[in-house]
Amino acid sequence: MQKFAVTFAVALYAIAVPVLEINETHVFSPDWIPHAKIHEVWQLITNSSIGLLCLWLVWGRKEYLIPTLLSLFVTGGFLIAFFIRDFYGGSMKFQDGTEKVLSGINIGILGFGTAAVFLFFSLFKTMKNKIK
């Protein structure tokens, strides 16, 4: 369960997100100011690096607590940013007003929400095993 949870989350934040964002809608968008672009690229590199570390810890060292927590920080950070978006003027909609959704649910919420649920189960199992 722990390996699956971390691997699933890493696949989303270290692979899928860069694939979806290294293009003209994000990194190469003419509508984004340069300062926002540097933050975007920084976030992509940081999250992908965290993901590689998590995979190494889970698959190479069979350690679960730190990779689960790190992955929760990444996915949870997105979820928090999404839910407080009105506070800072954020949006998941593109300039043309469209939004990537699946069955009416934003794909970020669907993916990272699912990953966070798996990660919480992984955290619970990891903590339960440490108490034994």
Label the model's feature ranges.
Residues M1-A11:
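Cytosolic juxtamembrane helix and N-cap/initiation of the first transmembrane helix
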Residues L12-E24:
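Alpha-helical transmembrane segments of multi-pass membrane proteins
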Residues I15-P18, H35-L55, F73-G76:
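Core segments of alpha-helical transmembrane spans in multipass integral membrane proteins
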Residues I22-A36, G90-K100:
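Membrane-interface interhelical loops and short amphipathic "cap" helices
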Residues N47, L69-D86, G113-T114:
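Hydrophobic alpha-helical membrane segments
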Residues L52-P67:
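Juxtamembrane helix-break-helix junctions at the cytosolic face
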Residues T98-G113:
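Individual transmembrane alpha-helices with interfacial aromatic-anchor signatures
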Residues F112-K130:
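Membrane-water interface at the C-terminal end of transmembrane alpha helices
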